[in-house]
């Protein structure tokens, strides 16, 4: 009992020293916790540290509520050995939970979004604010719970209770980390969704503006092409008439030229009694008669 009194007296000195630096703080010596709620003496702590306790299988986080800490008949060597091994066991369980899940059979019906407008597809600001508030609230509650479990762990005298509290702290820490990551991912997805919808809306507005500009340009082209088409048709008709007149005139000129040409003297008719050949023959005969 003297050792216990001295231990509590030292604890009182430490608490008074820390309390002197604060205000409105009552100095209270909290007793060590046991599963049965009774106080623990130094001799009892020594006996409990030497005792073994049943082997406890660490469950996955989704089966923590149904987990019985009293299950199993196997015995462990030391309570401290269990506390060191629990980190590896929990790490294996967390890795199993985080293993990739086959999603080949997962089919999402996207046709339900075809009839929705851009405003219906966007995430409201109230929903995004709710996600952020939920994340902060969950973080605050779990951190407070972890602090309570840590305080109980530091004051626990039973090895079984220390292991139970350490397991709870590990599970709560893992759950807080995963929940924060999931909620942050959901918020980022909603932000990306709203950003893409905003860009799509801007593209739709630009498309409508360009369509109206194209209609205006086509209307202006039609207004200019109407008179120009009529003029071009008249010009084509005049060009056709001009070509016809030129062809007729060229044919008439060719006919007149052919009629005014002299007779062709390259060929002679030997039987004809008119022309140059008979005259030459007559002159030749006259010369022969004169000479002869």
Swiss-Prot record:
Source organism, top-level taxon: Eukaryota
GO cellular component: kinetochore; nucleus
UniProt xrefs under Pfam families: CENPU (PF20994)
InterPro entries per the UniProt record, alphabetical: AME1 (IPR048743)
Physiological role: Component of the kinetochore, a multiprotein complex that assembles on centromeric DNA and attaches chromosomes to spindle microtubules, mediating chromosome segregation and sister chromatid segregation during meiosis and mitosis. Component of the inner kinetochore COMA subcomplex, which connects centromere-associated proteins and the outer kinetochore. COMA interacts with other inner kinetochore proteins to form the inner kinetochore constitutive centromere-associated network (CCAN), which serves as a structural platform for outer kinetochore assembly.
Family statement: Belongs to the CENP-U/AME1 family.
Listed name of the protein: Inner kinetochore subunit AME1
Organism encoding this protein: Kluyveromyces lactis (strain ATCC 8585 / CBS 2359 / DSM 70799 / NBRC 1267 / NRRL Y-1140 / WM37)
